[in-house]
Amino acid sequence: MVSNLESSIQNLTSAEYNCLADLNLYDSPECSRLATQAAAGRHLWVSDNFQDASVEVYLCEDDYPGWVSLSDVGLLQKATLPYRASRLSEADIKKLLPGAIAFTHQAMQQSNYYLWGGTVGPNYDCSGLMQAAFVSVGIWLPRDAYQQEAFTQAIAMAELEPGDLIFFGTPAKATHVGLYLGDGCYIHSSGKDKGRNGIGIDRLTETGDEVSRSYYQQLRGAGRVVKSYEPQGRK
């Protein structure tokens, strides 16, 4: 007798699917390290690259690749309508920023810890929190910090306004991102190493506490979200 899971695997084809529940995506076919997460309702494209225990997929909203365990394919349902991105003007986005900021404050009030690959509450990584906050008001950002930096409109630090993104890392690449709140403060999800192991508010200063100083030393610059990400249809 064929189980529901076995039936789901047998019927899985290269096509667009909806996530029926929150779903983990991994960075390799072994599914040993989390790459990102897909909230219930998201669209993903199942490729024809099947391995023994997983299949390669691409999230439709942000073109992000990953691997889904075949044990989770029962959480997928073939999409009846393809994903279509909404176009937003810069003025539209500006009106929505207070909602994105409010999302981060609400997330901080929940018990949470830093989770590499986390984009579904309560536990996030840095860029996952940014993506989730903006998606909560209908704005899509790319997934990773360096992608978000390239996607935003670069601005001088003196031009910072609440809702802008602040990037940290090495001279070569952005590896961390936070959301500017105003008055020299930003909110972010930081790890255990010189961070807060979760969501917290820090200051852009070299004279603050240890966490603020550590990130300020890695400051790269800032960017303004002026559009919503439109997928390139990667398959």
Segments the model singles out, each with a brief description of its role:
Residues 1-14, 45, 58-107, 112:
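Boundary regions of SH3-family modules and the immediately adjacent low-complexity/disordered segments
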Residues 4-6, 12-27, 35, 85, ...:
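Aromatic- and glycine-rich peptidoglycan recognition patches
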Residues 19-29, 143-150:
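Short, structured beta-strand/loop micro-motifs enriched in basic residues and often containing a Trp
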Residues 32-50:
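Conserved beta-strand/loop element in small beta-rich adapter and peptidoglycan-binding domains
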Residues 46, 57-58, 176-181:
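Short beta-strand-centered aromatic/proline hotspots
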Residues 51-56:
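Short aromatic-glycine-enriched beta-strand elements
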Residues 112-162:
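Catalytic cysteine-centered active-site loop
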Residues 141-207:
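...with weaker cross-activation on analogous glycine-rich loops/strands in unrelated enzymes
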